[in-house]
């Protein structure tokens, strides 16, 4: 049975997220806290789209974060896990750096531990303790944007991990420690 994120949990996190805006990572402190932030995400596996402002008037918006969490769920199991709002901030910054409002195409968002273990057995390119399993990572691309430019933008903002997978045609972005790697 799929794990669902309860709205009450999102509201609790929303209160904490307001505090986290004060203690934002260095790269995110360049944002004007009163300016709205938006994300446009297309889940390639489910056909669902998230297009909304997720942050406005100095606060993350719990309903928007809940919808983004749903769109980024593990499409294999239906499980959901709250997605780190600073991941959306990273995507917002990447889109701004690329001067693009095109949707980020989701290859992989949240992965349940079960899905991650299965993928780890099939491929040495899947980390056993992946940031995907804690809602802090996304594998993506943007139609019409060179993958190398997407990687450069993700690296330039310094948000966390950036993996470049040119053969598989995606870039991994996470909000863990800053690091870079190249996969296949």
Task: For each feature predicted by the language model, list its residue ranges.
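N-terminal export signals
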Residues: 1-4, 9-28
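Catalytic cores and adjacent binding grooves of peptidoglycan-active enzymes
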Residues: 4, 37-42, 125-184
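C-terminal segment of N-terminal export signals and the immediately downstream linker at the start
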Residues: 22-52
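A mature extracytoplasmic/lumenal domain signature
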Residues: 43-45, 54-56, 108-110, 142-144, ...
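Active-site acidic/histidine clusters and adjacent loop/turn architecture
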Residues: 57-107
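Extracytoplasmic/secreted envelope proteins and their assembly/folding machinery
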Residues: 88-92, 116, 147, 151
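Acidic helix-start/capping segments at beta-turn-to-alpha-helix junctions
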Residues: 103-117
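Charged, often glycine-rich, active-site loop that binds/positions anionic groups
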Residues: 113-128
């Amino acid at each position: 049975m799929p794990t669902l994120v309860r709205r009450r949990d999102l509201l609790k996190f929303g209160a904490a997220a307001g505090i986290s805006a004060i203690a934002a990572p260095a790269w995110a402190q360049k944002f004007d806290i009163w300016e709205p932030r938006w994300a446009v995400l297309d889940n390639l596996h489910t056909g669902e789209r998230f297009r909304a402002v997720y942050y406005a008037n100095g606060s993350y918006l719990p309903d928007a974060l809940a919808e983004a969490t749903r769109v980024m769920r593990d499409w294999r199991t239906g499980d959901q896990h709250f997605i780190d709002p600073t991941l959306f901030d990273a995507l917002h910054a990447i889109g701004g750096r690329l001067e693009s409002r095109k949707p980020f195409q989701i290859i992989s968002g949240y992965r349940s531990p079960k899905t991650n273990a299965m993928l780890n057995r099939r491929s040495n390119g899947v980390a056993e303790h992946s940031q995907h399993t804690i809602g802090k990572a996304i594998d993506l691309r943007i139609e019409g944007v060179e993958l190398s430019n997407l990687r450069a933008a993700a690296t330039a903002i310094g948000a966390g991990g950036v993996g470049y997978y040119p053969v598989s045609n995606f870039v991994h972005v996470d909000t863990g420690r800053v690091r870079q790697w190249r996969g296949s």
